[in-house]
Structure formats: structure tokens, C-alpha cells
A protein has these predicted regions:
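Small-residue-rich segments of transmembrane alpha-helices in multi-pass membrane proteins
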Residues: 29-38, 160-175, 222-226, 288-302
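Topogenic membrane-insertion module of multi-pass membrane proteins
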Residues: 2-56, 60, 149-153, 158, ...
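Multi-pass membrane catalytic core of lipid/isoprenoid biosynthesis enzymes
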Residues: 84-126, 221-253, 292-298
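Intramembrane alpha-helical segments
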Residues: 92-184
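Functional transmembrane core segments of multi-pass inner-membrane proteins
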Residues: 161-209, 215, 227-230
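Extended hydrophobic alpha-helices typical of membrane-associated regions
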Residues: 249-314
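Membrane-embedded alpha-helical segments that form the functional core of polytopic membrane enzymes
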Residues: 36-37, 46-74, 133-140, 184-203
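Acidic (Asp/Glu-rich) catalytic motifs at the cytosolic membrane interface
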Residues: 63-88, 199-221
Length: 317
């Protein structure tokens, strides 16, 4: 009993700054970009998505992303997967360096999940069962991503699942919140988001091959090996870039050429950086910063292009 009390007393209280660090705002692009894409797509297609629903969708996505990040950090720490020797930044490893009770992080993760659930219910209120079913699939993925007997993040399908759920289901659910209908065609135009987000996980797993082998994880890079993973990574990156040039034109006509201009001006160096790296453990911090930046500036160019198209249509209405 005394030992248990001493163990509890050694922990520091969770601060607001640490709660924000566990939410990992630098990764929110993986949820914000798909949400904004779905909002802009809905406006372009004439779906009745009002500002309240749009804001609620955006909030739900941010809270669910925060829940994924927090619960994933908790599970990795409890399992001993994350340590100070694993090339992680101090601000990105609160449980490793912060001295807080892991249970506090777990509870915070569930709080983020609950907030995301409430925001999602607000966004889909009165829209029928379709957005609720899509949201339920996303919520189940959040819970199964790091937890359960067979976590999604530890499977070879992790990249596909994370890319499809974040990059595909978020836009699909956003459009469904507008009119209660299923719009599967949005998944085609969401391909840059699906690939970009999937590559975030591949960046992490590609750098962590040796660490994941020790932890008993069966990730895709572990099966492929670093050399073949790197080839696949670079192929998908080039394909992602090509889609960013082509799909906006297919979706918005000549206005879509703006995306290519923005890519050349702001995203070229970001893509060049991630193509030059080799998914080595010692490059993990650079690799993760690079792929997040590529998502922000690459998929961000797509979002800005759609926003401009929406604005131009509003001005000509």
C-alpha cells in the first residue's frame, strides 16, 4: 500500500501545455485538410452544408485526431515501445519526458474522443443515418488504432486504413452531413488526401522497422524491408504529386490550374526533401516533419484552390 502511494506521488500533474502536446497539433493537418476538402467539395456541388455543421465537422475531426494521438502515445508508453533512445522529440513524447501518470493521458484521450463524438452528433443532427454510420466507422477505428487485441497500427494494413479513414471517410462523412446522402464519388477526388495521410504512417513505420520488430509489431515496412518500402514510398509520393496537378482541374476546370502554381511556389521543396530522405531511424524527426509539411503545403494547395473556386462561384452567383 505504501509502495503504491509512493509510486503515485512520483508523478507530476498533467498541465494544459502537456495536454495540448499529447493532442499533437502539428499532426492536425491529417484531419483538418480532409474536413476542409469535404466542406469545399460540398459547397462546389451545391450540397446544403451550413456554417454550423461545417464548424461542428471540423471540431469533430480535430478532437478525434487528438484522441488518436493521445491514446497511441499512451499505448506505446505502457508497452515500452517509446523511450528516450528512439529518436523522438521532447515535445512529441510527453509521457517519456514529462513524468506524468500514464492514466492521465489515457483519460485525456477518452475525453478527446467524447468531445469528438458530441461534435459529430451535432454535425449530423437531422441528417439521417448515413453520416452517423460513417462517423461510427471512424470512431471504431480510433479505438482499434492502438488498442484492442490486434491494434490497426501494428498491422500491415495500417497505412491503408489510416489513409482511407482520415483522407476518405472524413470528406465522405462531411458531404453526408450536408444532405444525408452517400456521395461515393468524393472518394476519387480525395485520393491525394488518402495517399498523403497514408504516407505519414509509412514514414513513421519505415523509420521504426527495427523498433517495431522488437515490439512484435507486424507493419507493412517490416514485411517489405527498408529498401522496398523506400521504393513504394517514393512511387506513392510522385503519384500523389501528379494527382494534385490533375484532379483539381477535373473538379473545377481551368480554376484548378491554381493548384499546380501553388505547388510549384510553396510545396516543391517539401516534396523534394521527403524524396531525398531514406526512412532511417536517425532521420525519423526530419522524416516526420517533412511528410507533415508536404501534407500541409501539398494538400493545402488543393484546399486553397477549392476555396478560391467556391469564392469565385459565390461572386458570380
Amino acid at each position: 500500500m505504501v509502495r503504491s502511494m509512493q509510486s503515485e506521488n512520483k508523478y507530476r500533474p498533467l498541465t494544459a501545455k502537456q495536454a495540448l502536446q499529447l493532442a499533437a497539433p502539428h499532426t492536425w493537418a491529417a484531419s483538418v485538410c480532409p474536413s476542409l476538402f469535404g466542406i469545399c467539395y460540398s459547397r462546389l456541388m451545391g450540397f446544403p452544408l451550413g456554417p454550423f455543421r461545417a464548424a461542428a465537422v471540423l471540431a469533430a475531426c480535430v478532437f478525434l485526431q487528438s484522441a488518436v494521438n493521445t491514446l497511441n502515445d499512451y499505448v506505446d508508453f505502457v508497452k515500452g515501445t517509446d523511450s528516450a533512445s528512439d529518436n523522438v522529440e521532447v515535445s512529441d513524447a510527453v509521457l517519456v519526458y514529462g513524468g506524468i501518470d500514464p492514466k492521465s493521458a489515457r483519460n485525456l484521450g477518452f475525453l478527446y474522443l467524447f468531445a469528438g463524438l458530441l461534435s459529430g452528433l451535432a454535425a449530423s443532427a437531422g441528417a439521417g443515418p448515413v453520416p452517423l454510420l460513417i462517423g461510427a466507422a471512424g470512431g471504431a477505428t480510433v479505438l482499434l488504432y492502438s488498442g484492442g487485441p490486434l491494434p490497426v497500427s501494428s498491422l500491415p494494413l495500417g497505412e491503408v486504413v489510416s489513409g482511407f479513414v482520415m483522407g476518405g471517410l472524413i470528406p465522405l462523412g462531411t458531404a453526408a452531413c450536408a444532405d444525408g446522402k452517400l456521395h461515393p464519388e468524393i472518394l476519387f477526388y480525395s485520393l491525394p488526401l488518402i495517399i498523403g495521410i497514408g504516407l505519414i504512417m509509412m514514414s513513421n513505420n519505415g523509420c521504426d522497422i527495427e523498433k517495431d520488430i522488437r515490439a512484435g509489431r507486424r507493419t507493412l515496412p517490416m514485411f517489405l524491408g527498408r529498401e522496398r518500402t523506400l521504393k513504394l514510398y517514393r512511387f506513392l509520393t510522385v503519384f500523389w504529386i501528379l494527382l494534385l496537378f490533375v484532379l483539381p482541374v477535373l473538379l473545377t476546370g481551368r480554376r484548378g490550374f491554381l493548384c499546380g502554381v501553388l505547388l510549384l511556389l510553396f510545396a516543391r521543396e517539401r516534396f523534394r526533401n521527403i524524396l531525398a530522405l531514406q526512412l532511417r531511424p536517425e532521420q525519423r524527426v526530419l522524416q516526420m516533419k517533412g511528410i507533415v509539411a508536404a501534407n500541409i503545403f501539398g494538400n493545402g494547395a488543393l484546399i486553397v484552390t477549392l476555396m478560391a473556386a467556391v469564392l469565385m462561384e459565390a461572386l458570380h452567383a
